[in-house]
Amino acid sequence: MIPATRSLLCAALLLLATSRLATGAPIANELRCQCLQTMAGIHLKNIQSLKVLPSGPHCTQTEVIATLKNGREACLDPEAPLVQKIVQKMLKGVPK
């Protein structure tokens, strides 16, 4: 192979390998807590689904996020007794 062609091929491969990094592709989904404020409770009939995010490197708190029937999301206080009851009721409704 001609040295100029080899150099050109190496440069193209290097450019291709680093272009993914240059696009700004996210490394992780979210690296912070999603809930800035929490509610002590909400009526169960307004909840469509419930998501419990355990604490981890992204956030030191367990987060409970309820998706409401109107499409909005609400952050619930995982320490509140009413929220704990809601989580238990939602878990009982999930088939094993």
Curated annotation (Swiss-Prot):
Major place of residence: secreted
PTM notes: The N-terminal processed form KC(5-72) is produced by proteolytic cleavage after secretion from bone marrow stromal cells.
Cellular component aspect of the GO annotation: extracellular space
Keyword set includes Secreted: yes
One example GO MF annotation: growth factor activity
Family annotation (InterPro entries): Chemokine_b/g/d (IPR039809), Chemokine_CXC (IPR001089), Chemokine_CXC_CS (IPR018048), Chemokine_IL8-like_dom (IPR001811), CXC_Chemokine_domain (IPR033899), Interleukin_8-like_sf (IPR036048)
Disulfide bonds: 33-59, 35-75
Localization: Secreted
Signal peptide positions on this chain: 1-24
Entry keyword set: Cytokine, Disulfide bond, Growth factor, Inflammatory response, Secreted, Signal
GO BP of this protein: cellular response to interleukin-17; immune response; inflammatory response; positive regulation of hematopoietic stem cell proliferation; positive regulation of neutrophil mediated killing of fungus; positive regulation of superoxide anion generation
Inducing factors: By platelet-derived growth factor. In lung, by lipopolysaccharide or inflammation.
Superkingdom of origin: Eukaryota
One Pfam family this sequence matches: IL8
Keyword Amino-acid biosynthesis: no
Protein's job: Has chemotactic activity for neutrophils. Contributes to neutrophil activation during inflammation. Hematoregulatory chemokine, which, in vitro, suppresses hematopoietic progenitor cell proliferation. KC(5-72) shows a highly enhanced hematopoietic activity.
Family recorded in the similarity comment: Belongs to the intercrine alpha (chemokine CxC) family.
Protein name: Growth-regulated alpha protein
Organism: Mus musculus (Mouse)
